Amino acid sequence: MEKLGMNEIREKFLSFFESKGHLRLPSFSLVPKNDKSLLLINSGMAPLKPYFTGKETPPSRRVTTCQRCIRTPDIERVGKTARHATFFEMLGNFSFGDYFKKEAIPWAWEFVAEVLKLPVDRLWVTIYEEDDEAFEIWNKIVGLPPERIVRMGKEDNFWEIGTGPCGPCSEIYFDRGEEKGCGKPDCGIGCDDCDRYVEFWNLVFTQFNKDEQGNYHRLPNPNIDTGMGLERIAAIMQGVDTIFDVDVIRGIRDFISDLAEVEYGKDADKDVSIRVITDHIRGITFMISDGILPSNEGRGYVLRRLLRRAARHGKLLGLNDAFLYKVVDSVVENYGGAYPEIIERKDYIKKIIKLEEERFKETVDQGLAILQDYINELKAQGKTVLEGAKAFKLYDTYGFPLDLTKEILQESGITIDEEGYKEELEKQRVRARSSRKEDNSLWEQDIYSTLGDISTKFVGYEVYESEAKVLAIVKDNEVVEQAEAGDDVSIILDVTPFYAESGGQVGDSGVIEEEDTLIKVNDCKKVGNKFIHIGTVERGLISVGDKVVAKIDVSKRKGAARNHTATHLLHKALKEVLGDHVNQSGSLVAYDRLRFDFSHYQAVSKEELKKIEERVNEKIYEQLPVVVEEKNYEDALKEGAVALFTEKYGDKVRVVKIDDYSMELCGGTHVKNTSEIGIFKIVSESAVGAGLRRIEALTGIEAIKYLNEQKEILDRVSETLKAQEKEVVSKIENLQQSLKDKEREIEGLKTKIASILAETLIDSAISVDGVKVIASRVEDYDMEALKTLGDILKDRLKSAAVILASSSKDKALFVGMATKDAVEKGVNMGAVIKETCSIAEGNGGGRAEMAQGTGKNISKVKEALEKAIEIVKGQLKA
């Protein structure tokens, strides 16, 4: 058996299936397209679901891919086992209603036995217990002995997700030899006690459709979906025990060892840390390359978790400063040949990682300060267990790993309520699941899938109206033969000039007419190859088979075309001004406005926005020709066309070229010359998520309307201030300065009043164990004023515990403060204010030195303050 490298195996697999008539597709982005059920692509099949369900037409009925994937459910086991990883590559061959078991099984055997040359006497297969067809093919056609074909139950060898397409599967195993076994007499396929038999290729035969009653119906055109883990087959081919010893991954592992000056294999704990970093940095690199940025939600949170976990393990190796960004060089060196995009984006990836590492270092320092407060509180209370909720807050808010919290607490003889921590963690998982709408619509049959193979020919690139035939009518989610005036309908035509919503561009509106019939079309969408014209029958009767004329609203189409070409100019200008790391992550192209979302790690400055706007307008005034061509996908990319990572492309693509300035793959409608755009005006720039920015802009007459509105506002402001336009800003600045001066005067007076009031309150203080205790209500003070008064009292009394209350907008306000020596004697204002606020039907808390809170019941303030004195007395006498 030849020791093939990962890159060699990947290429051999893809080339083999190309020789069997498969179209090789590049790996899809880790960001799922139009699939809310997935946070990240986690299998080779995941990005191909629309093809399996008929929602979209595949570029070929036979496809082969090597798909990069991310899975994190077992993240805590990564580094501790031989095979667990969050990032992996999945080799696959797929058939969309073309070939089936008779081809898939022999081809799989041919590849493993003849191309990879695995020893056939060490290969085993499993099949679904009722799949006699698969048994016959393995036994009679392939020639595998019956004793090496293992029948297994539904749990192991039948693939299904709820309702929809499903079917049996067959898995191929490699026997690593008796020395890897557990030695038990019944050791075999599926043994839980050893890793002797390794499954490396799963062939799924999607031949049934499961209905809601649990019945299985044979699909007229069954599919093939296979998946082989590249790292796993590489480990087998290279005769190594873990994926971290495989050639490509080992290169990254050794780079980390050298960086940390730690020899791998000498220290079990350090080896775990090296493996964790080796795994995580691969996923981190590809996630950022695919446009994901660290955040506190969704896939951004997954990325942040991987980054911080890897950084934490670096700390355990003595790498205290930012280092992960350096490891990207090794990832690019080892994976760049297969994924050239990470070579292009290397500098951007490193910049994002370094920024996040530096931010994490800051939050770790903040977390340490808060943890020390928790330790002081526990010692003051004589407790030795930290609440799980507090440990979780350190993890969730400050990215503080649980093991680091444990380690620091142990030094003070304190442990963590781990059950409480797990409860908080589970609550967060529940919140995350509920916030992400489960959407299995890709697997569900909709009304349009019942219409068979009818399709619509789109002619809207060439004409604004066309004759057509009505193929289907849908009303109230039911297929009908006809509709009449007043009915809301969805109509499918055989030919249409209506652009269907896609690529961010809104669908066309217009009318469908025949002699006495008029349908007002408000929108057009696409399901598979069917264009759905959504609207209302204004007059007459429309029936299936009718000959009609479809006309779009030309003025709206031209508006959308202006805005779509403008987004291409904007995309290019953003890259020129901000950097090549900018990638489009979403857009809206309407007839009256445009919106463009893009990856960038900070707000765009006013100066940068000005440059971007000027650059776009320069290209408009240069009157650049806009040319649309159809090209081969690979050729278009070689010529420099920009492809969006969230889109799927077929072999033939539509290329929109704006002279020599911009070239993008795009299916939208465009102007023929940039001069038709007229003018481009940015109206806003904002954040839409971590690392994602949004620009909204106007073109043409809409931009002129906007500028006129701004001029009217400026005129009104000028008139109000009694100043000329050029003097407006300085006049406002003078007014602002005057206002600040008055506010300072007011604050000074408040401080003087507080100082006078403090003398009165000091007279009311009681002394407990040498500490002056004050609990008093003052009227018309907000929270900040209460804190100021509390600081004055602390300064004057030197040794004090102060609880102050006031009211604001129908709620009670409480502030508690204690001097350092009072805290050392046992005073804990966090506990005092928490109980005080609860009496006033509210919530509060904080640190031992300072706490605050509110209450809903103002009438309970007196009772709450009396209770506060009791609590402080108890703390001091404890």
Curated annotation (Swiss-Prot):
Binding site for Zn(2+): H564, H568, C666, H670
Name recorded for this polypeptide: Alanine--tRNA ligase
Protein family (similarity comment): Belongs to the class-II aminoacyl-tRNA synthetase family.
Keywords, comma-separated and alphabetical: Aminoacyl-tRNA synthetase, ATP-binding, Cytoplasm, Ligase, Metal-binding, Nucleotide-binding, Protein biosynthesis, RNA-binding, tRNA-binding, Zinc
Chain segments annotated as coiled-coil in the UniProt record: none
Biological processes, Gene Ontology terms: alanyl-tRNA aminoacylation
PROSITE patterns: AA_TRNA_LIGASE_II_ALA (PS50860)
Cellular component terms (Gene Ontology): cytosol
SUPFAM superfamilies named in the record: Class II aaRS and biotin synthetases (SSF55681), Putative anticodon-binding domain of alanyl-tRNA synthetase (AlaRS) (SSF101353), ThrRS/AlaRS common domain (SSF55186), Translation proteins (SSF50447)
Note on domains (UniProt): Consists of three domains; the N-terminal catalytic domain, the editing domain and the C-terminal C-Ala domain. The editing domain removes incorrectly charged amino acids, while the C-Ala domain, along with tRNA(Ala), serves as a bridge to cooperatively bring together the editing and aminoacylation centers thus stimulating deacylation of misacylated tRNAs.
Gene Ontology molecular-function annotations: alanine-tRNA ligase activity; aminoacyl-tRNA deacylase activity; ATP binding; catalytic activity, acting on a protein; transferase activity; tRNA binding; zinc ion binding
Protein localization: Cytoplasm
EC number: 6.1.1.7
Cofactor: Zn(2+)
Cofactor note: Binds 1 zinc ion per subunit.
Role description: Catalyzes the attachment of alanine to tRNA(Ala) in a two-step reaction: alanine is first activated by ATP to form Ala-AMP and then transferred to the acceptor end of tRNA(Ala). Also edits incorrectly charged Ser-tRNA(Ala) and Gly-tRNA(Ala) via its editing domain.
Entries under Pfam families matching the protein: DHHA1, tRNA-synt_2c, tRNA_SAD
Catalytic activity: tRNA(Ala) + L-alanine + ATP = L-alanyl-tRNA(Ala) + AMP + diphosphate
NCBIfam families given in the database record: alaS
Organism: Caldanaerobacter subterraneus subsp. tengcongensis (strain DSM 15242 / JCM 11007 / NBRC 100824 / MB4) (Thermoanaerobacter tengcongensis)
Broad EC category: ligase
